[in-house]
A protein has these predicted regions:
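Beta-propeller domains
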Residues: 1-60
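Short, conserved, GDST-rich strand-edge loop motifs in beta-rich repeat architectures
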Residues: 97-117
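Beta-rich, blade/repeat-based domains predominating
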Residues: 29-47, 79-89, 140-153
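Entry beta-strands of beta-propeller and related beta-repeat scaffolds
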Residues: 49, 92-96
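Beta-propeller fold detector
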Residues: 21-29, 71-77, 119, 128-141
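A detector of repeated loop/turn-to-beta-strand junctions in beta-rich toroidal repeat architectures
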Residues: 7, 56-58, 70, 111-116
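Sequence/structural signature of beta-propeller modules
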Residues: 129-170
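Short loop/turn segments immediately following beta-strands, especially the blade-tip
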Residues: 12-21, 61-69, 119-131
Length: 170
């Protein structure tokens, strides 16, 4: 999957009969309002696709169990702007940051909703905020991206051998 910023579309890139193809499979919000999709995250089981749109501050969830016909099943406003999303492998914890580019970032808005890091839990029906940092209030600069460290992602893929960690080939 990929998104197009100014036309606000989701495209599927797939292989068929030994040829790569692409096709538009969904619109994201009202394209005339330029929601500006900036980040996507696919669940570990490849069934769900999260799409963040910076201009309206929303995250949208699509059921992509049939990748040729996704269905939007959820949306939530995360802040006045939203940029990156990172999710845990079990799909229960989500981390959002807000800064796209310093010169483009909004300068006015709700307290705590312009420059932030926010953590949420997903229960299968709603995102519930569990933690947040207002980067303006804390004078921390512009939060662009947050990712899990390699140990958190790949802890099960390591084997101790002579007291050294070795990545296993699969």
């Amino acid at each position: 999957f990929t998104t197009t910023a100014l036309t606000s579309e989701i495209w599927l890139i797939y292989e068929e009969e030994n040829q790569w193809k692409s096709k538009k499979i969904a619109d994201i919000g009202d394209a005339s309002k330029i929601p500006l999709p900036v980040d996507i995250s696919i669940s570990a089981d490849d069934q769900l696709l999260w799409v963040n749109t910076w201009n309206d501050g929303e995250t949208r969830l699509y059921d992509v169990s049939n990748p040729h016909a996704p269905k939007q099943i959820f949306n939530k406003k995360i802040g006045d702007q939203v940029n990156m999303v990172s999710q845990s492998w079990d799909g229960k914890r989500f981390y959002y940051t807000s800064s796209l580019l310093g010169n483009w970032d909004k300068k006015t808005g709700s307290k705590g909703d312009l420059q932030y890091f926010k953590a949420f839990t997903w229960d299968g029906a709603d995102l519930t905020q569990t933690f947040g940092i207002d980067f303006i209030e804390a004078k921390l600069g512009l939060p662009h991206q947050m990712r899990f460290g390699a140990k958190a992602l790949y802890a099960n893929l390591y084997s101790k051998q002579n007291d050294k960690r070795v990545a296993l080939s699969r």
